[in-house]
Each structure stands twice: as structure tokens, then as C-alpha cells.
């Protein structure tokens, strides 16, 4: 990408590039060429793309009135999309034609008309669904294929967390007639050697209604648990007694052997119902048959998911408040020892120490009581109690998704605190407060260069920000080291003294943790966030992590998963905007 010239920078000063805290200019000018301005949504942007880069790209198309790259309110990092507003609709149309899916800093951008009215974005008319897409079909190929039928408001291939196509996508036309033409022309067409399915997009409510209609009038049956000795004649004869049959077939493999299931299609729904009622759980050649309504794969998956969710909720309710998580266990503690330690506090339904494939203790386990009261009593009595030379950590067990959600909230809270501290520090510096300025503490990350750990005398600041000359954090092999007091002097009273040593302890722990975390990831931002999350634990829980690689690995994985979950939520917010 060409560098921004002085002339471009000068032009940018005359633009109404809005403040990050304000909303982008509104408008849904795609609905009519009579509108005097046009607002475009520009998505899939590389994080470093700025308003200046976008101006350099879009200004040759026409007169740009404003540009805004949307950013996180706390971290100020790009959310991956922007709004570009032109002074006339024709310039916006040309920008879509000429720049849509062109690379910006190595990424293909996605441009569409900005739809500020939610009712226009969510309307069903003109929106179509495409499935069975070849993995090589990307957003540009999808757009190019369907744009010949009319103006497209948006198009998108659904992708997984790794950016790979899920095999389906959506195209939203401005006009409903264009959508109908596309369906008529492309449904069943071969695209990259695969026959695609194109149909109007249905909302979940409409799909559920359609499914209920199918259930109420089904004629096709699925039969399983069929004995391998069963013949086609036996199978058809068994079902023919309930009414006229359109077809009956037993599924076979390439060698002609039965797969153990088949299908029967009746002429009338009533006959199919009779067959299900009479033959389900009946025996044929010594095997108990299953006979039920035939379902499509996606419907079966939906049913299985609902069953699993019901089971999961039932299990959650059953163990709510009674299942305890116990960590920092000595390697000598086994299931029996764990149960013995907690037995005095109530009836234990299970006690388990988690182990590796080789049978080695992972240093944590679970104890399940019969009532919440017993579990609460055990937490009160056993948490921080020494067992086999180690202080136990005992708490109510939480699901992974709950822990990840909590850790993600901690990330957001920490980002907000850091932003507020930096803002307050800048304000204090601007006010010229002599001798009292303390640099903001950046917990969970290495301090920025030029900012020392301890309170400064500005003329004595270490330019390496509290780091030794070799640039590596100091090593502490035997726990935290309480160093020299800050340059502002010793603590004046007992309370200040306690706070001072707590700060030094946290600093020492953070330095050691950061070293272990940074050895696991090359992403500096992730290393800082993960270190901060682990450092939020009480010090007595952090110390064991420095000694036990297995305990550290467990906490690192949880914090890393929470960080990734947080990043995905940001990306989803970007897509929904």
C-alpha cells in the first residue's frame, strides 16, 4: 500500500473523521439513489488499518465526507470494520464495484451498503440461503456468482473458528425479484464440481414451523436393528399389511451385506402412524426393531443437541453446590486418602483424584457431597488446611465455560482499569503535580519502557523501566524478594508498610509468572493478559504454580482459553455490527 503523502494528510485534516467515542454517521442510502449521501460498511479489515489508509484508498473514487474505524472503547484496538461516507450515492456505488474484495494490507476487504435501520437488515425478503458449497468458494466468489442478478446488500460465507468454510452462506439482495431470479437460475447448478442448493432464507421460527408441519404429515419411516438374515421380501411383507407402500428398501454396503437399517414410504400418513405404533419395539428374526419417522440429518442433530442439553442441565442441577474442586494435592494423595480427608463433613457420593494417562496425579481432584450444606462446611474447614505438607485450595467446582466467562470479564475489567489509570496519570502530569506523581501499574504485562516499577524521582528514572541491563526480569528462585523501598522513601506507618510489601510481592510473582507464560506463547499481548488473569489469584494459590509445572499448565490452559473466548466475542461483535 502506498504511503500517505503530505497532501493526503492535509486533506485528512479537512475531513470530518469522528472521535472514537462517537457513533459513525448514519444512513441507509442503498435504498434509493435519490439520497444525497452514501454510507458504506467496510469489513474484514486488518487491525492496523487506519482512517488515513482508508482515505487514501477511497478518496480517488469520489468526495469522502467522513471515515471512522470502529475501535474497542477500552483498548482502542480496531474491531476490524469501518464506515466510509461519501457525499453522493453514485460514488458509493462505484466504490463497491471497484474496491469490494480488493486487498487492504494483505486482507480482502468486504464492502456493502450500511444499513442503520435494523428492520431493513433483518427483513427476510431478498435474503437467500446457499449450501453444499465447495471449500474453495470464498466471499468474493460467492459475490461474483450472485451479483449478476441484482444489487447485493450483503454476502457472507459461514466459517469456523479457524476461518475455514462451513459449506454454506447467505446473500441478501436489495430487491426480492433479484433473489427469486437467482434461486431459479442457480439452484441445482454445479459450482466447482458440487451441486449447490439455493433457497429463500428462513428464520428459525419459520424453520421450526415447517418442521412441525412435516411431523404432522409424515409418510416416510426409518427402521433400524434389522437382522442381517432379513430379506427384502420379508421386510416389505412386514410393512405392507398396514397400507399401500410407495417404496421399501434395505440399505446394503458395496459387498451386498445389510447395514442393519432401511426405509419404508407409505402413500398415506395414517398408514405410517399405524406401522410405527404396531412395529416399534417388535421383534424380527430375533432382533428388536426401532421404527419411527424418518428424519433429515440436520433435524436429527437438532434433536440430539436438545437431548444433550436437557441431560447437561439435569446434571448441573443435580450437582449444583455439592461438587467441590480440590487442588494443590500432593502426589501421595489418592482417591481413598482424598475421601478420608473430607469424610468428617458429610456423606460423600464420590471422590476422585485426576491423573494422567501414565497414572500420575495432576495435583487436583473432585469431592461430591450429598447436600450443599455439607459441601459448604467442607470448604470452610478444609480450604488452606495443610494435607501432606501442602495447603489445599477447596471451592465449588465450576464448568469450563463459566470459568472462561469469568476470566474474560476479568480481562475487560483489567483493560478498563488500565485505561482509567493511564488517563488519570496523563491528567496529573498535565496539571504539573510536583513530587506526587506515581506511574500507573500495568498488572499482567511487562512495564512499558521508561516507566519504572517504583515511584520516581523524575531525574533518577531507570530508562529500562525497572528492568536489569540485560533486559530480562530478575529471577527469584525461592519466592518473592522484598527489595529496596521506592525512591520516595520508606513507608511511614504499619498500614503503608503492609501495602508496600504486598505490592512488592505481587511484582515479584508477576515477573516470575510472566517468564513462564511468555515461554508458552510468542504473542506479547496474550502473555500479558494471561499473566494478569493468573496473578488475580490469591498469592497462596500462585506460589504452587511456580513450583508445579502441571498446576501451571492447567491454569495456563484455562486462562488461554478465556483469552481466546474474549477475542472471539470481539470478532462476533464485529460481524454483527
UniProtKB/Swiss-Prot annotation:
Basic and acidic residues bias (residue ranges): 1-10
PANTHER family reported for this sequence: RNA BINDING PROTEIN
Ranges where the PABC domain occurs: 489-568
Listed result of changing residue 170 to V: In PAB1-6; selectively reduces poly(A) RNA binding. In PAB1-16; reduces affinity for oligo(A) about 100-fold, impairs poly(A)-dependent translation, but still interacts with eIF4G. In PAB1-15; fails to bind RNA
Sequence ranges assigned to domain RRM in this UniProt record: 38-116, 126-203, 219-296, 322-399
Effect of residue 83 to V: In PAB1-16; reduces affinity for oligo(A) about 100-fold, impairs poly(A)-dependent translation, but still interacts with eIF4G. In PAB1-15; fails to bind RNA
Region entry Required and sufficient for nuclear export, spans: 9-61
Record motif Nuclear export signal, residues: 12-17
Stretches for region Interaction with SUP35: 473-577
Biased amino acid composition, Polar residues: 11-27
Required and sufficient for nuclear import, as annotated region: 281-317
Post-translational modification Omega-N-methylarginine, affected residues: 107
Record-given protein name: Polyadenylate-binding protein, cytoplasmic and nuclear
Keywords assigned: Acetylation, Cytoplasm, Isopeptide bond, Methylation, mRNA processing, mRNA transport, Nucleus, Phosphoprotein, Repeat, RNA-binding, Translation regulation, Transport, Ubl conjugation
Region spans: Disordered: 1-36
Family (UniProt): Belongs to the polyadenylate-binding protein type-1 family.
Impact when changing residue 263 to V: In PAB1-7. In PAB1-15; fails to bind RNA
Keyword field contains Ubl conjugation: yes
One cellular component term from this protein's GO annotations in UniProt: cytosol
Function noted in UniProt: Binds the poly(A) tail of mRNA. Appears to be an important mediator of the multiple roles of the poly(A) tail in mRNA biogenesis, stability and translation. In the nucleus, interacts with the nuclear cleavage factor IA (CFIA), which is required for both mRNA cleavage and polyadenylation. Is also required for efficient mRNA export to the cytoplasm. Acts in concert with a poly(A)-specific nuclease (PAN) to affect poly(A) tail shortening, which may occur concomitantly with either nucleocytoplasmic mRNA transport or translational initiation.
Source organism per UniProt: Saccharomyces cerevisiae (strain ATCC 204508 / S288c)
Record-level GO BP terms: mRNA 3'-end processing; mRNA transport; regulation of nuclear-transcribed mRNA poly(A) tail shortening; regulation of translational initiation
Glycyl lysine isopeptide (Lys-Gly) (interchain with G-Cter in ubiquitin), cross-linked positions: 7, 337
Gene Ontology MF terms: molecular condensate scaffold activity; mRNA 3'-UTR binding; mRNA binding; poly(A) binding; poly(U) RNA binding; promoter-specific chromatin binding; ribonuclease inhibitor activity
InterPro entries: Nucleotide-bd_a/b_plait_sf, PABP-dom, PABP_1234, PABP_HYD_C, PABP_RRM1, RBD_domain_sf, RRM2_I_PABPs, RRM_dom
Residue(s) carrying N-acetylalanine: 2
Domain of life from the UniProt record: Eukaryota
Amino acid at each position: 500500500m502506498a504511503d500517505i503523502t503530505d497532501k493526503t494528510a492535509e486533506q485528512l485534516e479537512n475531513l470530518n473523521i469522528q472521535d472514537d467515542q462517537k457513533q459513525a454517521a448514519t444512513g441507509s442510502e442503498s435504498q434509493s439513489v435519490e439520497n444525497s449521501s452514501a454510507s458504506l460498511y467496510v469489513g474484514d479489515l486488518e487491525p492496523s488499518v487506519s482512517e488515513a489508509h482508508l482515505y487514501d484508498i477511497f478518496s480517488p473514487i469520489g468526495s469522502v465526507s467522513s471515515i471512522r474505524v470502529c475501535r474497542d472503547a477500552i483498548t482502542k484496538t480496531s474491531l476490524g470494520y469501518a464506515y466510509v461516507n461519501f457525499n453522493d450515492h453514485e460514488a458509493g456505488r462505484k466504490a463497491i464495484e471497484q474496491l469490494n474484495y480488493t486487498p487492504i494490507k494483505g486482507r480482502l476487504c468486504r464492502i456493502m451498503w450500511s444499513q442503520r435501520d435494523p428492520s431493513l437488515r433483518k427483513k427476510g425478503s431478498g435474503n437467500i440461503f446457499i449450501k453444499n458449497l465447495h471449500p474453495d468458494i470464498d466471499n468474493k466468489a460467492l459475490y461474483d456468482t450472485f451479483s449478476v442478478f441484482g444489487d447485493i446488500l450483503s454476502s457472507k460465507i459461514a466459517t469456523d473458528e479457524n476461518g475455514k468454510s462451513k459449506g454454506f452462506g447467505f446473500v441478501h439482495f436489495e430487491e426480492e425479484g433479484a433473489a427469486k431470479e437467482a434461486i431459479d437460475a442457480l439452484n441445482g447448478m454445479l459450482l466447482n464440481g458440487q451441486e449447490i442448493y439455493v433457497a429463500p432464507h428462513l428464520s428459525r421460527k419459520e424453520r421450526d414451523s415447517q418442521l412441525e408441519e412435516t411431523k404432522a404429515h409424515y409418510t416416510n419411516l426409518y427402521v433400524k436393528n434389522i437382522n442381517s438374515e432379513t430379506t427384502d421380501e420379508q421386510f416389505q411383507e412386514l410393512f405392507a399389511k398396514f397400507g399401500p407402500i410407495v417404496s421399501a428398501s434395505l440399505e446394503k454396503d458395496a459387498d451386498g451385506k445389510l447395514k442393519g437399517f432401511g426405509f419404508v414410504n407409505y402413500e398415506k400418513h395414517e398408514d405410517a402412524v399405524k406401522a410405527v405404533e404396531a412395529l416399534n419395539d417388535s421383534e424380527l428374526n430375533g432382533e428388536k426393531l426401532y421404527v419411527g419417522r424418518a428424519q433429515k440429518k440436520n433435524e436429527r442433530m437438532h434433536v440430539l443437541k436438545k437431548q444433550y442439553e436437557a441431560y447437561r442441565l439435569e446434571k448441573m442441577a443435580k450437582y449444583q453446590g455439592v461438587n467441590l474442586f480440590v487442588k494443590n494435592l500432593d502426589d501421595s494423595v489418592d482417591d481413598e486418602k482424598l475421601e478420608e480427608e473430607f469424610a468428617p463433613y458429610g456423606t460423600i457420593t464420590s471422590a476422585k483424584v485426576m491423573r494422567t494417562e501414565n497414572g500420575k496425579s495432576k495435583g487436583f481432584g473432585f469431592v461430591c457431597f450429598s447436600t450443599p450444606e455439607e459441601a459448604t462446611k467442607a470448604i470452610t474447614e478444609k480450604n488452606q488446611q495443610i494435607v501432606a505438607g501442602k495447603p489445599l485450595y477447596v471451592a465449588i467446582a465450576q464448568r469450563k465455560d463459566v470459568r472462561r466467562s469469568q476470566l474474560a470479564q476479568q480481562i475487560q475489567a483489567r483493560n478498563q482499569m488500565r485505561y482509567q489509570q493511564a488517563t488519570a496519570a496523563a491528567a496529573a502530569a498535565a496539571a504539573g503535580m510536583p513530587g506526587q506523581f506515581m506511574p500507573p501499574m500495568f498488572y499482567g504485562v511487562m512495564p512499558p519502557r521508561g516507566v519504572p516499577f517504583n515511584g520516581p524521582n523524575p531525574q533518577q528514572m531507570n530508562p529500562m523501566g525497572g528492568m536489569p541491563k540485560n533486559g530480562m526480569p530478575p529471577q527469584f528462585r525461592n519466592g518473592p524478594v522484598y527489595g529496596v523501598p521506592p525512591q520516595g522513601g520508606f513507608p511511614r506507618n504499619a498500614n503503608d508498610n503492609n501495602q508496600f510489601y504486598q505490592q512488592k510481592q505481587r511484582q515479584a510473582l508477576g515477573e516470575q509468572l510472566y517468564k513462564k507464560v511468555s515461554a508458552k506463547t510468542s504473542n506479547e499481548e496474550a502473555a500479558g493478559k494471561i499473566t494478569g488473569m493468573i496473578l488475580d489469584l490469591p498469592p497462596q494459590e500462585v506460589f504452587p504454580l511456580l513450583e508445579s509445572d502441571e498446576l501451571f499448565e492447567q491454569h495456563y490452559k484455562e486462562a488461554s482459553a478465556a483469552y481466546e473466548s474474549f477475542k472471539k466475542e470481539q470478532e462476533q461483535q464485529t460481524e454483527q455490527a
